[in-house]
């Protein structure tokens, strides 16, 4: 969904949603976004958070996977500024969410943390000294590409055995549907978690989540990890992740807090981007859109 709203200096008004239709490609997506923005009036800046790896220097899409065909290289900032004649800023959606959590969510008071979101895939962000670490090619935090099951890499699919394939909500659904094809989303799955065969699949999925998090703890030694995505609202998931990670990490790594995102679900997905972008653009009369 494309979620948009107008920041009036205190809150968001005129909240709207429209289908992304990502499979139609990047050019079609830009036309949908422009049409949505044209439905607003009297704004002085535009902020966009989007899937894909964003070159924050020029506001273009450095890389996007096949979920949005033709999106790689898209000059989003340039397109918006030329269309609307106002300044624009573009940021990766998870990075924007992490900065929103830093300012007004569960990252408050912690300048160094990791933020991961679990949904269709797994997105990640690294916050160091109060800023997102972009990496050499704006791709730092691509945790979904970590290989956690090398034994599954047999073909040309780059995601075989990777964290994103195994630990995402999509990965959970894929597992469970092999047992019961009617359980095709997270809500249905957790409504059936008392069934032993379903709980077994959920626990195996949580094990994969924890394998990735323990690896990240060894690399970054964070004091806090923030987990977002609708599936993390399940109390059982967060409780088990905390228990298993703390049991597996080396004592020398200290204690890591694993906490749910405060802002990164539903309207908060857009809000986290907005909270950051208001520091870079105008504080009032700014229009924001989250392209999910």
Regions found by a protein language model. Name each.
Residues 17-19, 66, 137:
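Short clusters of small/polar residues that mark proteolytic maturation junctions
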Residues 51:
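Conserved NAD(P)H cofactor-binding loop of Rossmann-fold oxidoreductase domains
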Residues 108-162:
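Glycine-rich phosphate-binding loop of actin/hexokinase-like ATP-binding domains
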């Amino acid at each position: 969904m494309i979620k948009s709203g107008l920041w009036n200096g205190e809150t968001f008004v005129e909240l709207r949603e429209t289908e992304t239709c990502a499979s139609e490609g990047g050019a079609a997506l830009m036309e949908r976004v422009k049409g949505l923005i044209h439905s607003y009036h009297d704004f002085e800046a535009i902020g966009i958070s989007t899937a894909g790896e964003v070159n924050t220097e020029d506001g273009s899409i450095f890389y996007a996977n096949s979920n949005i065909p033709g999106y790689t290289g898209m000059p989003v900032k340039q397109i918006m500024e030329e269309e609307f004649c106002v300044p624009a800023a573009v940021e990766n959606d998870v990075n924007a969410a992490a900065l929103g959590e830093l300012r007004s969510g569960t990252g408050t008071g912690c300048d160094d943390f990791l933020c991961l979101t679990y949904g269709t895939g797994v997105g990640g962000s690294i916050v160091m000294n109060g800023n997102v670490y972009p990496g050499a090619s704006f791709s730092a935090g691509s945790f979904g590409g970590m290989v956690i099951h090398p034994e599954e890499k047999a073909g040309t699919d780059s995601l075989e055995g990777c964290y994103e394939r195994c630990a995402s909500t999509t990965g959970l659904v894929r597992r469970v549907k092999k047992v019961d094809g009617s359980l095709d989303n997270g809500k249905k799955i957790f409504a059936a978690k008392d069934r032993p065969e379903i709980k077994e699949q959920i626990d195996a999925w949580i094990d994969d989540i924890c394998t990735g998090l323990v690896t990240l703890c060894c690399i970054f030694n964070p004091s806090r990890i923030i987990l977002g995505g609708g599936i993390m609202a399940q109390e059982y998931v967060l409780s088990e992740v905390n228990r298993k990670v703390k049991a597996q990490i080396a004592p020398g790594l200290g204690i890591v807090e694993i906490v749910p995102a405060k802002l990164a679900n539903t309207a908060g997905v857009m809000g986290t981007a907005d909270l950051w972008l208001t520091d870079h653009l105008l504080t009032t009369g700014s229009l924001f859109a989250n392209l999910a």
